[in-house]
Amino acid sequence: MRIKRVSGVAVFSFMIACCSLLFVGDLHAAYQLGVVLPLSGEFEKIGKNLLHAAELSAEKIARDKGIQLKLVVKDDKNEPREAERVARELASDPALIGVIGHYYSSAALGAAPVYDAARIPALCIAASDRNVGKSGPYVFSMYYSNEKQAEMMAAHLTRVFRKKNVLMISSKDRFGTTLRDAFQAKAGRLGIRIAKRLEHDQAGPLAADFIASALPDRRENQQFDAVVVMSHAPQGLKLVKQLRKQGIRAMIMGPDSFNSPDFLDERLISEEDTKDVFVASPFLWEMGNDRALKFRRDFRRTSGQEPHISAAACSDAVLMFASAIEKGNNDRKKIRDYFASLKWQTAVSGITGELFFNKEDRMMDRDVFLTEIKDGRFKVNYVQLTEPHEPYVFKEKKERLAKGYLVELDNRIYQWVDVVFVGLDFFRINDVNLQKMAFDAEFFLWFKWMSDKINVEEITILNASASSRALLKEDLGASVKYRAYRCKGSYVNSFNLEYFPFDRQSLPVTLGHKSKNSTHVMLVVDSRHMAFDPVQEIYPQEWTYVNKEHDAGMHRFDSTYGDPDYRLGKGYKSKIYFSTATVSVTLKRIILPYLFNTFLPLLVILLITVFIFRIPVEQFALRFNLSMTSLLSVLVYHLTQKSALPRIGYLMALDYYFIVAYMFVLTLIAFNVFAMTRVLEEKIEATQQLNNLLMKIFFPATIMVYTILSAYFAMIAQT
């Protein structure tokens, strides 16, 4: 007996030692990643917002990919000198694989030469100055350049809005001057006349009469059919108010710095003043994919705040380092080379889209989207100009120009993308059929669009197995067309039954165009006009409403459709994406009926099994027969429960309850065999005492195990 105890202790100690080694190994396997943000001073709030995004991303990557990233956090106060000092501090750490951070371009420019000299790959989050990427081969920016933004603003202004006579206002700092110079150069080539130029100092407050002094003649001011403002958000806000006060009602176009909640705050600026104000943007939550939806939801849940638009880029920067490591690039040079090798065909799919860098300046190759400040939000404009990447687009240039799919400006081609707003309100869930992996629902569906080239009848529900729609109302005479339907049908869905019956199920309806891909049509969810009240009619009545969610995204079919142009180049298949819009309602299963219908019968079977302990240990045959009957009862009951559910390749929460029951009954059978051998050895009294002890322990232990299981699964299901 002593030898067995010593052996048991030795085995247990060995297991603990192995676990400790594994744990220590994981710690040593963690990759250290520098994160430099303004965590104090004027930009502290934004810096902490971005830091939370980086932490969330690192946690998700560790959970999903098993890659441990230890964030080494530093504060640069968004100041160039402090950024340089912090960069030197990080550069002295040989364990660091890379750096993410710096908010303004000025701070990034202060740190970039240090990173390049130390050969540390650095991803700057919001640096739009092209000189950041040109600082050296180890420095990249997650943003597009000021030059690209200004040129795309000019392209939209002349081709989409048909404006030719412009008032330009810019700040005198590098941000304003690079935007100004690039816009002026592009405007000159596009035939846009800059009727007047104004400049203001970035340092210090903007004079309250800046516009009134510079443009005193209200009558003369009516010559401008557009105003372009190249300034930071605080000055931009004041300039917009002063322009409106001076009677200038022309459209105003601002850079991405205007993506500030201040422009949506009626305490700071009226809705009348922001009418016809358009803003450039590298990313929009309204157009975000499912990753963006989950990130935004997790960010709100964990911080109680709305993520800053640059928080998405910060999260993507962490993802890019993880992607490099996942592909075997585990040192600085390999990671840098991986970043430099990325292109459209091999891009990393992130929250903000496909991630890859320009070769000439190592700035992120992003589209510049245009939004309108309307209804208290940055609303996607009905027309977007995007740059093509696929070879087949250039090959079919002449044909596509003739059809209006492309426009050519300044010897460059742009894709003309029509935006369609899609809204959907559920009013009845008729059935949730887990076995068929489908649900039946009724809802109102509507579309809003401007282009005559769009036929909304060709926008279909992608996951519908059977669906019908009846026209309710329409208005095709206005500039913004509108059509609404009442829909009813059955929709395919891949239910997640891992936590059944503690589960929540999302019931999505996904829409996409039948034939036009994302280079022609972009779907955006019309969340402004959707209802988010609970769905009252849900059948069968074992579900309760949780929430309603929506996202936009891209769906790629793994097919060339037989088009030879999609196979240009050896071994390459064009990435043909279709824009999709998804609206889903989340339901939670009511657990109370399952306590009586599922778990109570199982507990009754186990309770009856406990009474076997009341049978004298000498009556082995009777005890064994009853034990086998209990085992068969649990097995049949388990199979009966499973027959009502679909076949899946993983264990459900319900299965664990039956596993505990099997262990309980099998333990009892094993004890009966043990008791028989003891009785044959004429140790009846000692065996009966052990039997009585087990009778007192078994059922309370089972109840305790089931309680712990229930609490665990209920907690997991909530998160």
Where do the PLM segments sit?
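Beta-alpha junction/loop-to-helix N-cap segments that form part of ligand/metal-binding clefts
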Residues: 45-50, 60-133, 200-205
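Extracellular/periplasmic periplasmic-binding protein-like sensory domains
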Residues: 190, 240-315, 329
